[in-house]
């Protein structure tokens, strides 16, 4: 009865509409019409006659084929008008979907005869558009055999359109059924059960896939670029049986569903779907259909990997008519796009309403990309339901659930983060461009290529062979790798990608691969800035946003300013509509995410081209200033800004953080805290430890750390798990290191540098010391000229000191005093030698005529020199001036006297000045008294001038020698004691014990036994042996003799 009443009503409507034109056609008896009408409610549809408007408002039929060009080519742009009693006049502005499939798309059918190519040409008659250009409406339909598709509005009201059999499709009066669409059965998504498994699987594939692409497709904002998902459509045997094994009907159903899903994804996510392969099973079921949809999905993955592996695709989609447990109608592997596990299974829930399958397909593609189900906090105003809902179909409560074609703001925010992470670079190429890319020499590394430096003529990579696109034998990596230097892998720890913001982290090479690790950042919600938090690797801080707009003194305005956003005015709103340019008023809970209001700062914006508003009002006797920018691009509060506890702003809405940011499981030893509560977690599941903590899970106390918190980072309280590999390493954030703790490598470098500095200082000191130690005192010029290279030094008979040693042992006290005298004597000798060297250019002067005295052709270097310490023999000689000589001038010598200049007898009374004899050891008991005598004589020296005084001096020397060796040991002891009392230790203080009688020196002792009566002119006198050995005197004596 119900069916009969429906058919009767349908017949009445059709007859009233068509009149006598179609009165002869009994559309109630058509099998297709009867099957469709059985699914309609009596009051939920109406018959309409759509028509097409072409140029110059010409009204034609609904056939969109362009017969002027090709019979099977449809117009790119069409406009369909539908007059409805309920909706009024609907003007559908449509554009052909040129990406749904291409000429290269292969349509295959598998039957008992094997695999065959479907010969019938598939027409592209699939359109997308809006109602009257209103962006808040949704239209997707096909026009191959009448109009068949969906028309939806922003409030969730959805209508389906279906063509009736009969009549002329080229006429303007072809009947269609316009009906209100709602879900008629329970339907759930099965992907939630596979979420955890799929996510773990995806993490293993992300880095492997990116290692081939992310170095060339560098991280960049691709949210505005169109992405293309190439899919392989498979219709299993159960699905084909439900459609009577009609090839074109099955293909049309799948393409209509794909067209609707493509329209949803392209509007909000800028993703296009394209069928690159279509396969129909018309003989047997090639995979097992289990009640467990997850197990069935595994069979789809195995089939796609084993049978259609040669098809270059991003995902495989199976349409089936099988039934699964728990009313599950779809399933997909979470975040598996561009991998071998990228597969979707969709049940054909409605035979005539393809838009329900289109919604399921769009949701499944979202799961492949990484989108999760929306929570109750996510909305897509004004539509009550969003695409990523967990339960698409619900029955009860006065009707079914509405059709959803909008993605929530949570899903849009998640997808934007996925694009920023750069994990889906495979979607940037257009369909069928893979064959062009996957060839050696195009400069892009793809497939099994190890490198690709372009053509042989243009290759600049010394590590890559341009002919085979493989590494050269000596190379470990290629030049395009971030962790490669001169064809060798960079050592572990080298930074290959620096941080770009306070919420970003620097990646380091691992020393095993030339690829830089995946780009990661601190997880969303990490505190940063003045009052901000991390969002997609950047710090979202309203204070900093105000400072960028109004200057450094600007701050966020009072909360009352944000309440103005509910007005939807130009200066206070939650966004601008693209269709008519009007502004969205904010909901009360979203006011903080609308127009950003600031106060203070400059009067006008820093960017003078921006249109700004400033208004003041008083509240509770308090003056409040609100400054805003009338530009949605820069005037709205930035995404990721904290708007409430655990909530963030996304596209003008305040949503829960957990609904827009995927949870990341970082290693920890406390399940309640990420990174053990001592660090921050990154999107790559690694920990950045606080100062004083280290280890994979930041659970080890240490004196140093790779992180010192800046930017006001606080500890997170969200949970996490520790089910991560021990291979994870604590990484470093260089720009956040503002403390005093240094790295071990830094300390080692400082220590090494300090050691090198000390070594250089030591070398410099050694060089300076060596230079100073080799300085030689130059000899006087006259000594250099007079010295003969053949000169020999003769020492003669050296005295024996054995007796002296014996005496030293017997009386150490005496010899101790003598040693002190010896040291003083050596110092005086050194001083005398220096004076002699300095006066080497002086000459002996004859007092009689002032002429210099030359002895043996050599000028005496000591003639006329002032005597610093005169010997006792010379002092006594001056007392006996009556002694005559044989006419020779006595010359001062050390150890002997000689004369070479004749002196006349008349001059015997003259005096010879500045002449000294060698020192002779004297009795020491009268040293003090003799010292006073020498001092008085030094002040008024008296020269002797005759030979007699000269000979007398000789006698004195002999007598002094006799006195020295003739005295007893007691006298020597008393002399030493006297010397000790006086305190003198110089040669000038060595005097005689008492004055001696000059008459006792009549017979001087001559050298070599010569008698005193000898008349020889050259006298060589032997000086008495001294108690002290003076090598300087010995050297000078020999030089004088020679």
From Swiss-Prot:
Residues 768-1042 are cytoplasmic. This is Disintegrin and metalloproteinase domain-containing protein unc-71. Glycans are attached at residues 103, 155, 538, 703. Disulfide bonds join 338-426, 378-410, 380-386, 496-516, 666-681, 675-687, 689-698. It comes from Caenorhabditis elegans. Residues 1-23 form the signal peptide. It holds the Pfam family Reprolysin. The keyword Heme does not apply. Residues 437-524 form the Disintegrin domain.
């Amino acid at each position: 009865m119900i069916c009969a009443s429906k058919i009767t009503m349908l017949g009445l409507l059709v007859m009233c509409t068509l009149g006598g034109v179609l009165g002869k056609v009994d559309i109630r008896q058509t099998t297709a019409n009867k099957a469709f009408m059985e699914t309609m409610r009596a009051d939920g549809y109406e018959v309409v006659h759509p028509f097409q408007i072409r140029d110059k408002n010409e009204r034609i039929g609904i056939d969109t084929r362009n017969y002027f060009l090709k019979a099977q080519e449809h117009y790119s742009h069409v406009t369909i008008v539908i007059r409805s009693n309920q909706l009024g006049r609907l003007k559908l502005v449509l554009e052909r979907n040129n990406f749904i499939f291409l000429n290269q798309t292969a349509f295959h059918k598998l039957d008992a005869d094997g695999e065959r190519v479907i010969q019938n040409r598939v027409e592209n008659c699939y359109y997308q558009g809006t109602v009257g250009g209103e962006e808040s409406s949704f239209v997707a339909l096909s026009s191959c055999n009448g109009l068949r598709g969906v028309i939806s509005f922003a409030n969730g009201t959805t209508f389906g359109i279906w063509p009736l059999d009969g009549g002329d499709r080229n006429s303007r009066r072809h009947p269609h059924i316009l009906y209100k669409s709602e879900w008629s059965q329970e339907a759930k998504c099965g992907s939630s059960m596979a979420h955890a498994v799929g996510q773990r699987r995806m993490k293993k594939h992300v880095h492997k896939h990116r290692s081939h692409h992310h170095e060339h497709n560098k991280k960049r904002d691709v949210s505005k670029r169109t992405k293309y998902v190439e899919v392989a459509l498979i219709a299993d045997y159960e699905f084909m049986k439900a459609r009577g094994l009609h090839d074109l009907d099955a293909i049309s159903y799948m393409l209509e569903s794909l067209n609707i899903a493509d329209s949803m994804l392209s509007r909000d996510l800028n993703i296009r779907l394209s069928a690159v392969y279509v396969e129909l099973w018309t003989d047997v079921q090639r995979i097992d259909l289990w009640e467990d949809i997850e197990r069935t999905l595994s069979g789809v993955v195995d089939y796609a990997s084993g049978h259609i592996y040669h098809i270059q695709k991003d995902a495989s989609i199976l349409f089936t008519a099988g039934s699964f447990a728990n009313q599950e109608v779809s399933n997909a592997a979470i975040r598996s796009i561009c991998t071998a596990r990228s597969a979707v299974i969709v049940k054909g829930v409605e035979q005539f309403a393809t838009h329900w399958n289109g919604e399921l397909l769009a949701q499944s593609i979202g799961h492949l990309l990484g989108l999760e189900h929306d929570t109750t906090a996510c909305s897509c105003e004004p539509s009550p339901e969003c695409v990523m809902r967990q339960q698409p179909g619900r029955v009860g409560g006065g009707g079914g659930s509405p059709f959803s074609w909008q993605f929530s703001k949570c899903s849009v925010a998640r997808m934007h983060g996925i694009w920023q992470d750069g994990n889906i670079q495979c979607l940037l190429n257009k369909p069928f461009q893979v064959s062009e890319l996957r060839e050696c020499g195009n400069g892009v590394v793809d497939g099994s290529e190890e490198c690709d430096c372009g053509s042989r003529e243009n290759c600049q990579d010394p590590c890559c062979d341009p002919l085979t696109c493989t590494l050269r034998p000596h190379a470990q990596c290629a030049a395009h790798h971030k962790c490669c230097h001169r064809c060798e892998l960079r050592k572990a720890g080298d930074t290959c990608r620096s941080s770009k913001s306070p919420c970003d982290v620097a990646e380091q090479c691992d020393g095993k691969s030339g690829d830089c690790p995946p780009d990661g950042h601190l997880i969303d919600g990490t505190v940063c800035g003045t009052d901000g938090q991390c969002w997609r690797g950047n710090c979202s801080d309203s204070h900093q946003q105000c400072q960028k707009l109004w200057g450094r003194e600007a701050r966020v305005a009072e909360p009352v300013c944000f309440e103005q956003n509910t007005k939807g005015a130009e200066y206070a709103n939650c966004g601008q509509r693209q269709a008519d340019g009007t502004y969205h008023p904010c909901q009360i809970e979203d006011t903080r995410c609308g127009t950003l209001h600031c106060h203070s700062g400059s009067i006008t914006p820093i960017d003078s081209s921006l249109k700004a508003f400033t208004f003041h009002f008083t509240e509770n006797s308090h003056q409040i200033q609100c400054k805003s920018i009338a530009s949605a691009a820069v005037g709205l509060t930035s995404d990721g800004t904290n708007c409430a506890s655990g909530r963030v702003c996304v596209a003008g809405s305040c949503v829960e953080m957990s609904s827009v940011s995927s949870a990341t499981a970082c290693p920890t030893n406390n399940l309640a805290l990420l990174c053990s509560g001592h660090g921050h977690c990154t999107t790559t599941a690694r920990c950045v430890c606080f100062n004083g903590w280290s280890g994979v899970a930041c659970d080890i106390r240490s004196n140093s750390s790779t992180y010192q918190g800046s930017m006001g980072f606080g500890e997170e309280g969200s949970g996490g798990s520790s089910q991560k590999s021990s291979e994870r390493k604590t990484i470093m954030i260089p720009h956040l290191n503002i403390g005093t703790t240094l790295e071990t490598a830094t300390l080692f470098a400082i220590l090494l540098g300090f050691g090198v500095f000390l070594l250089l200082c030591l070398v410099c000191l050694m060089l300076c010391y060596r230079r100073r130690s080799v300085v030689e005192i130059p000899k006087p010029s006259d000594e250099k000229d007079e010295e003969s290279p053949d000169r020999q030094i003769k020492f003669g008979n050296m005295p024996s000191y054995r007796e002296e040693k014996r005496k030293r042992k017997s009386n150490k006290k005496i010899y101790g005093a003598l040693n002190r005298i010896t040291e003083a004597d050596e110092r005086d000798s050194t001083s005398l030698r220096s004076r002699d060297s300095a006066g080497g250019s002086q000459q002996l002067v004859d007092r009689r005529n002032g002429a210099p005295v030359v002895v043996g052709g050599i000028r005496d270097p000591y003639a006329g020199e002032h005597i610093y310490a005169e010997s006792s023999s010379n002092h006594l000689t001056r007392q006996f001036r009556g002694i005559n000589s044989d006419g020779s001038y006595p010359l001062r010598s050390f150890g002997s006297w000689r004369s070479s200049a004749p002196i006349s007898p008349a001059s015997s009374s003259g005096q010879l000045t500045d002449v000294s004899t060698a020192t002779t050891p004297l009795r020491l008991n009268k040293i003090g008294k003799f010292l006073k005598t020498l001092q008085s004589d030094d002040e008024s020296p008296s020269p002797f001038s005759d030979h007699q005084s000269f000979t007398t001096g000789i006698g004195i020397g002999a007598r002094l020698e006799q006195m020295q060796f003739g005295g007893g040991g007691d006298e020597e002891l008393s002399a030493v004691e006297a010397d000790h009392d006086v305190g003198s230790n110089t040669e000038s203080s060595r005097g005689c014990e008492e004055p001696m009688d000059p008459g006792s020196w009549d017979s001087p002792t001559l050298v070599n036994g010569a008698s005193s009566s000898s008349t020889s002119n050259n006298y060589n006198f032997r000086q008495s042996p001294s108690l002290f050995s003076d090598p300087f005197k010995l050297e000078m004596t020999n030089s004088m003799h020679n």
